[in-house]
A protein has these predicted regions:
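A "functional boundary" signal
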Residues: 2-210
């Protein structure tokens, strides 16, 4: 998300020194990627060891939740396998809230690999009333994400604006469910301000995140 907002900011009337600072932050993140990858793999290995020693479906379900968090945006095929394991465990436990949570994981993967139709079908099959507070926030964010990506790859300007409008409808809902001042809150607020063409405000908020 940081990269997306950064790229949007480069076309705005921003002082060169501010752009340089943001680019240095991005460059540092890229250079440190091998270190982050090694650390993440170590965390994944530790979770897999815990899974082999787990004794209950509840424990396994919780561990798979953590494992999904490590695989998302890292290995999408593994993330999908983990999400499906969560669905199977949730069904075995006959826990509808757990089932919906795991299905949202699958939707996230579908959206992440550009299978937007499949992701939307999963989202459309879930009712927000069947989710807890964190699940609703996650649910709204996946709708926002899929429409944002569909706008990015839309063939015509008309369709681009249509999908951007759909994504925008979810921004306020997401902001209202995030802790004021948190990074997630500030990043979503900056995206909203960019959409509203309040560029200076958006950049000031973005700078405060890093």
């Amino acid at each position: 998300m940081f990269l997306a907002v950064l790229l949007a900011s480069l076309s705005l009337d921003v002082h060169p020194s501010e752009i340089d600072s943001l680019l240095r932050e991005l460059d540092m993140s890229i250079r440190n990627r091998p270190q982050y990858t090694l650390k993440r793999q170590e965390q994944i290995d530790a979770l897999q060891r815990k899974l082999r020693l787990s004794h209950s479906d509840q424990e396994r379900y919780d561990l798979y939740r953590e494992l999904f968090g490590k695989y998302r945006s890292y290995r999408m095929d593994s993330a999908l396998w983990v999400a499906n394991q969560r669905v199977e465990l949730a069904k075995r436990m006959k826990n509808s809230l757990y089932i919906r949570s795991a299905e949202l994981n699958i939707a996230e993967v579908m959206i992440g690999v550009a299978m937007y139709k499949e992701g939307l079908e999963i989202l459309d099959g879930i009712k927000s009333a069947d989710l807890d507070a964190s699940g609703v926030s996650y649910y709204y964010y996946q709708y926002h994400q899929v429409y944002t990506l569909m706008a990015d790859y839309a063939f015509s300007d008309q369709m681009k604006e249509h999908y951007r409008g759909l994504a925008y409808q979810y921004k306020d809902s997401i902001i209202s469910m995030r802790r004021p001042g948190s990074q997630g809150y500030l990043l979503m607020m900056s995206e909203k301000l960019l959409y509203e063409e309040k560029y200076d405000e958006a950049i000031e908020i973005l700078k405060s995140c890093y």
